[in-house]
């Protein structure tokens, strides 16, 4: 035991010194190497050599595996799950699997419903319009699935013309949605029964 740390230099003996020329106290990953924080993990393998409460960071994102919800994927999410990929940087993690109930998506599903939009993260009705009223393309009907995108975003639109049901002058005619003069003929000159 040339370094006097209590671990023998014979590589085939019991508890052989992995660092025979340097006195050390590591016992977890290898015997007899330096362990600055005294947690048992050698400084060679310890991702946090100065912190005895943390030892391993499998994905290299500076979070210990014990606090990292995605130990094999580097990430910077902090709000719903810690240490998972967060493409848009809003703090909510990107989805890793599809929600079990995509119609009623919520934060407990563990991921950002809109991972490419930093202003939106929650989409309760799963229609693609975020529930944050101050974010981009906010859902005016956050609990009702909808495809409207002309007068307001994310509200029911039975004829899929872009105008929400409550504001569509022709709710069953997809080529007309507005009638400014109220004469029963649509304002879209290319639609069915246009106003002359």
What annotation goes with each model-predicted range?
Residues 1-196:
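Extracellular calcium-associated, cysteine-rich motifs in secreted modular proteins
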């Amino acid at each position: 035991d040339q370094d006097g740390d209590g671990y023998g230099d014979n590589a085939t003996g019991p508890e052989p010194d992995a660092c025979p020329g340097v006195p050390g106290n590591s016992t977890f990953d290898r015997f007899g190497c330096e362990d600055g924080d005294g947690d048992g993990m050698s400084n060679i393998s310890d991702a946090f050599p100065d912190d005895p409460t943390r030892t391993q960071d499998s994905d290299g994102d500076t979070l210990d595996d014990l606090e990292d919800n995605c130990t094999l994927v580097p990430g910077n999410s902090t709000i719903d799950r810690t240490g998972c990929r967060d493409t848009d940087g809003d703090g909510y993690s990107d989805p890793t699997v599809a929600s079990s109930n995509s119609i009623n998506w919520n934060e407990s599903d563990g991921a950002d419903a809109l991972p490419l939009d930093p202003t939106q993260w929650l989409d309760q009705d799963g229609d693609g319009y975020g529930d944050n009223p101050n974010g981009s393309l906010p859902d005016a009907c956050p609990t009702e699935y909808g495809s409207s995108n002309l007068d307001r975003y994310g509200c029911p639109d039975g004829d899929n013309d872009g105008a929400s049901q409550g504001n569509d002058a022709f709710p069953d005619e997809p080529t007309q949605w507005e009638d400014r003069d109220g004469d029963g003929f649509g304002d879209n000159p290319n639609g069915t029964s246009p106003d002359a």
